[in-house]
Amino acid sequence: MPSRLPAFRLLLVQLVVVLVAAISLWISWGPVAGYSGLLGGMIAWLPNCYFAYKAFRFSGARAAREIVRSFYAGEAGKLILTAVLFALAFAGVKPLMAPALFGVYLLTLMVSWCAPLLMGKTFTRP
């Protein structure tokens, strides 16, 4: 469980960022911007959840092959899931505000890019 804790924290921070961004868009630009932003955030967050589940199922030196295999499967599944979710959003949601969708999508990805800078010190042990 301790090796999974940083991934869980990151997913939780991403979810909070998605919700705050979607609510901010809803208040400032209206409901279409709000749900478009929420969709964009979910398009980034759900595949990250899938990857975390797949990547951190195994631990220990004896499971090295399974760990590598699960990382590859998690990343492939993440890419496919992202493409499918984008396709569903653009095909099935009308009206959709694309700048809000892509903006919150990128903001959510940036949380994971910046996580080592923001949360790095909380993961180390003495």
From Swiss-Prot:
InterPro entries: ATP_synth_I
Subcellular location: Cell inner membrane
Transmembrane segments: 10-30, 32-52, 71-93, 98-120
GO cellular component terms given for this protein: plasma membrane; proton-transporting ATP synthase complex
Ribonucleoprotein as UniProt keyword: no
Lipid bilayer topology: Multi-pass membrane protein
Family: Belongs to the bacterial AtpI family.
Protein name as annotated: ATP synthase protein I
Organism: Pseudomonas aeruginosa (strain ATCC 15692 / DSM 22644 / CIP 104116 / JCM 14847 / LMG 12228 / 1C / PRS 101 / PAO1)
